Amino acid sequence: MKQLYGVIGNPIGHSLSPVMHNNAFEHLNMDAHYHAFLVEEEVLGEAVRGLKALGISGFNVTTPHKVAIMEYLDEIDPLARKIGAVNTVVHKNGRLIGYNTDGIGFVRALQSISHEPLQGKRILLLGAGGASRAIYFSLADVGVKEIDVANRTVDKAKELIAARTADVNSVALSLEKATEEQGNYDIIIQTTTIGMHPHVEHTPLQICSLKKGTIVSDIIYNPFETKILCEAKEQGAIIQNGIDMFVYQGALAFEMWTGSVPNIGRMKQLVIEKLGG
């Protein structure tokens, strides 16, 4: 019997997940299909119960349901609970189990371009929203000890840091202070929507004094190179856009659902082609 997978969200028509997962199923000769489901906020509970009744094997969760879905699940992974959001659900033995692969996917993406272990690196996160929270706790989970958080409102950065449970040294900074301190970091991670199309001229941080070998990563992938990445490249930094994070979090969900490891390079190439790159 064909296995059913999918993604729920609103809007959902722009989702790149179906083409990525369906191609992986085809490549691995798996009898499965991945479908995008438009789900309004007011019917989320009914939608989740309906998917469970249909026998869906697993599904992704995107905006605006990542937090609200938690009350409709049978079990939530400890890391997802710490992050406070779920983006992947596994249907196992009649139970819906929620996970968060955003942060771990980002960590794997970062590891793919870093020539050294992340554990000894000093990292600066720009932003203190949901994506930053997922990345912060996932970095802490793999043993990173120095993670500072810069945000327009410093109190929000302080709230994120205060929620930590691991042994992590963290300081909350204003964006102005982060601009001054940027040369002290090995890795800078941009987690906000600043610089996303159509506001491509905006940047949360002017790159002006990076040290040699700095990695600058932006979770945005439209445009492929945001202003912060362009400035970082001019400074000689190693840069990474959000395509890698998207692909690695999707590949991790695929692995959790099926037990099979998809071809990351193939997934990435498909996404780039769909984005017109």
UniProtKB/Swiss-Prot annotation:
Annotated metabolic or biological route of this protein: Metabolic intermediate biosynthesis; chorismate biosynthesis; chorismate from D-erythrose 4-phosphate and phosphoenolpyruvate: step 4/7
Gene3D superfamilies on file: Leucine Dehydrogenase, chain A, domain 1, NAD(P)-binding Rossmann-like Domain
Protein EC: 1.1.1.25
Positions annotated as active site in the UniProt record: K66
Catalytic activity: shikimate + NADP(+) = 3-dehydroshikimate + NADPH + H(+)
Ranges that cross the membrane: none
Residues annotated for shikimate binding in this entry: S15, L16, S17, T62, N87, D102, Y221
Family statement: Belongs to the shikimate dehydrogenase family.
Assembly notes: Homodimer.
Protein name (Swiss-Prot/TrEMBL): Shikimate dehydrogenase (NADP(+))
Annotated organism of origin: Bacillus cereus (strain G9842)
Gene that encodes the chain: aroE
